[in-house]
């Protein structure tokens, strides 16, 4: 068979082959082989550490092949991102459905490099701004359209920030942080003034592990219509604070171990604990309403999803379920729970249902290989971030895995946040943070 090579290339290949054989076995006599190939017999090289030409080309081909495979993967990712960015909208209805069902592209639009591992990220509810907290206790504010320099930066705590939350109320942006220094602090932010400390709350006796800020329902007899703050701690307590007055309105112990995370919806508060349980509490009264059992290791994050329902439907029939929540754990699973409806009595706070006081596990989501540290939600989707360096998007209504971002960070993924699918500006943003000191921004 004729080789697809010129005479000169054939001669160089024969010489390189003989040179390689002599380099491999210096005692071999290749004179006869050289004569049969009609090339000059090579001489023994003095530098025995130098690879012959054939070996160098062979390793170069392997490196080029790996590079080609990497470039082909990048092309596929970029093509996928381009299709998502330029997908046409055929009608207002289909465009709105696609926006609500949006899933972030494979590659981030931009990345922010911080001075230490990222511990928390929160999007501004109204502006294209993200707040990032770090292991060194610093709180940064970045414009998503220009991340070259932060809009504001402050040393918020003396130790690592463990949790951050943002809320807009009466034309003011409030940023709340919890820290390992046992402090809870509230800052105000504006484009002109930056971050300004409004108030510090001292009352916990151990690490503050989670914070949430919201406006209390006017129907409650405690903090109704006021700006409230909830914090949980390793001291096993949950505290409700009035941001304006600085008073602690309520303190209760939903668990007997470290309360690692919490979320608030109206007058209901849900917590996850070191003992692997979850608990739903009516925070104005402190009444424990129901408990979630099913995780094998500590619960790392918890979040209400969807909307909570009234006890009686519009048709007058009793509704057995209050709503849904999602929890993530060190057992490498996430669970979608149905929350049982508490018993409501006239002129009295809710109490546990007499026959049904346990969460019902609707779905168990498996796909991560390590601890699942954080969870975010957007419409019918929940996003779980794990120590296996990946993020997975799930449809929480049916438990289906929709997309997985492998090696989204070079280390553990510690936090995630997404914009609200009902945002009036119809934006599509996802941000993640990791111990690689990076904050990745996915947007369209």
From Swiss-Prot:
Main location: cytoplasm
Gene Ontology BP annotations: cell division; establishment of mitotic spindle orientation; microtubule sliding
Alphabetical keyword list: Cell cycle, Cell division, Coiled coil, Cytoplasm, Cytoskeleton, Microtubule, Mitosis, Repeat, Transport, WD repeat
Pfam families: WD40 (PF00400)
Cell location: Cytoplasm, Cytoskeleton; Cytoplasm, Cytoskeleton, Spindle pole
Alphabetical list of SMART domains matching this protein: WD40
Recorded GO MF terms: dynein complex binding
InterPro entries to which the protein is assigned, alphabetical: ASTRA_WD_repeat, Dynein_regulator_LIS1, LIS1_N, WD40/YVTN_repeat-like_dom_sf, WD40_repeat_dom_sf, WD40_rpt
WD repeats: 113-152, 156-199, 204-251, 254-293, 307-347, 367-406, 408-444
Cellular component terms per the entry's GO annotation: cytoplasm; microtubule; microtubule associated complex; spindle pole
Coiled-coil blocks: 59-87
Family: Belongs to the WD repeat LIS1/nudF family.
Purpose: Positively regulates the activity of the minus-end directed microtubule motor protein dynein. Plays a central role in positioning the mitotic spindle at the bud neck during cell division. Targets cytoplasmic dynein to microtubule plus ends, thereby promoting dynein-mediated microtubule sliding along the bud cortex and consequently the movement of the mitotic spindle to the bud neck.
Subunit description: Self-associates. Interacts with NDL1 and dynein.
Protein name: Nuclear distribution protein PAC1
Protein species of origin: Zygosaccharomyces rouxii (strain ATCC 2623 / CBS 732 / NBRC 1130 / NCYC 568 / NRRL Y-229)
């Amino acid at each position: 068979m004729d080789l697809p090579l010129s005479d000169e290339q054939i001669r160089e290949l024969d010489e390189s082959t003989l040179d390689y054989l002599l380099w491999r076995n210096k005692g071999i006599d290749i004179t006869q082989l050289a004569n049969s190939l009609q090339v000059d017999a090579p001489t023994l090289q003095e530098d025995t550490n130098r690879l012959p030409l054939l070996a160098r080309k062979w390793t170069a081909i392997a490196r080029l092949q790996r590079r080609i495979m990497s470039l082909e993967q990048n092309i596929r990712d970029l093509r996928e991102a381009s299709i998502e960015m330029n997908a046409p909208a055929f009608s207002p209805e289909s465009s709105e459905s696609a926006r609500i069902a949006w899933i972030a592209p494979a590659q981030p639009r931009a990345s922010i490099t911080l001075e230490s591992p990222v511990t928390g990220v929160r999007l501004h509810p109204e502006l294209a701004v993200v707040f990032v907290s770090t292991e060194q206790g610093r709180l940064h504010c970045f414009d998503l359209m220009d991340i070259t320099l932060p809009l504001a930066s402050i040393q918020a705590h003396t130790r690592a920030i463990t949790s951050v939350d943002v809320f807009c109320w009466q034309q003011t942006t409030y940023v709340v942080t919890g820290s390992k220094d046992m402090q809870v602090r509230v800052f105000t932010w504006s484009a002109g003034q930056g971050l300004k400390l409004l108030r510090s709350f001292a009352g916990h006796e151990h690490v503050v592990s989670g914070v949430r800020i919201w406006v209390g329902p006017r129907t409650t007899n405690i903090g109704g219509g006021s700006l409230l703050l909830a914090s949980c701690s390793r001291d096993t307590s949950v505290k409700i604070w009035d941001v304006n007055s600085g008073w602690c309105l309520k303190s209760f112990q939903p668990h007997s171990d470290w309360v690692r995370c919490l979320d608030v919806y109206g007058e209901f508060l849900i917590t996850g604990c070191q003992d692997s349980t979850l608990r739903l509490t009516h925070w104005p009264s402190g009444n424990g309403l129901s408990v979630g059992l099913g995780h094998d290791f500590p619960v790392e994050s918890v979040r209400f999803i969807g909307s909570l329902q009234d006890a009686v439907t519009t048709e007058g029939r009793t509704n057995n379920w209050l709503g849904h929540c999602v929890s993530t754990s060190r057992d490498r699973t996430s669970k979608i729970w149905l929350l049982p409806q508490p018993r409501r009595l006239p002129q009295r706070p809710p109490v546990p249902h007499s026959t049904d006081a346990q969460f019902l596990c609707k779905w168990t989501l498996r796909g991560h290989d390590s601890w699942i540290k954080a969870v975010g939600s957007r419409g019918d989707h929940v996003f779980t971030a794990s120590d296996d360096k990946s993020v997975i998007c799930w449809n929480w209504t049916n438990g289906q895995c929709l997309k997985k971002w492998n090696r989204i960070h070079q280390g553990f993924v510690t936090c995630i946040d997404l914009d609200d699918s009902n945002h009036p500006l119809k934006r599509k943003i996802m941000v993640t943070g990791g111990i690689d000191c990076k904050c990745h921004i996915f947007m369209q």
